[in-house]
């Protein structure tokens, strides 16, 4: 099983942490396992509470049903159903910027 370095950043939240997450663990679960509290609601990819923005790297969010193609092309990802597929950097707490 592959493990990736995932950097979670957000200046307003004073967050800049790099954690290891297995390929079969969601970003949200991995953050929680490492003591990082991120916003969430449904845990099923059907709302936008946990949305983040992938700044660098690759992820798999094929289980999500909320974001449209344009939002995903801008890097938005629902962290409750997003799995790392490479080392990556993700801006957290992005729901206010999801238009």
From Swiss-Prot:
The keyword Iron-sulfur applies. [2Fe-2S] cluster binds at residues 42, 47, 50, 80. Its cofactor is [2Fe-2S] cluster. SUPFAM superfamilies: 2Fe-2S ferredoxin-like (SSF54292). One of its GO terms (molecular function) is electron transfer activity. Residues 4-96 form the 2Fe-2S ferredoxin-type domain. It comes from the Bacteria. Keywords: 2Fe-2S, Electron transport, Heterocyst, Iron, Iron-sulfur, Metal-binding, Transport. This ferredoxin is expressed by heterocysts and differs from the ferredoxin expressed in vegetative cells. Ferredoxins are iron-sulfur proteins that transfer electrons in a wide variety of metabolic reactions. PANTHER family: FERREDOXIN, FERREDOXIN-2, CHLOROPLASTIC. Belongs to the 2Fe2S plant-type ferredoxin family. This is Ferredoxin, heterocyst. It comes from Microchaete diplosiphon. The lineage of its organism: Bacteria, Bacillati, Cyanobacteriota, Cyanophyceae, Nostocales.
């Amino acid at each position: 099983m592959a493990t990736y370095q995932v950097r979670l950043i957000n200046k307003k939240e004073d967050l800049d942490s790099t954690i290891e997450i297995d390929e079969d663990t969601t970003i949200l679960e991995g953050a929680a396992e490492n003591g990082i509290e991120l916003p969430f609601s449904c845990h099923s990819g059907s709302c936008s509470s946990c949305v983040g923005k992938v700044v660098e790297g690759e992820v798999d969010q094929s289980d999500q049903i909320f974001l449209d193609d344009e939002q995903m092309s801008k890097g938005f990802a629902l962290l409750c159903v997003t799995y790392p597929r490479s080392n990556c950097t993700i801006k957290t707490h992005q729901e206010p910027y999801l238009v």
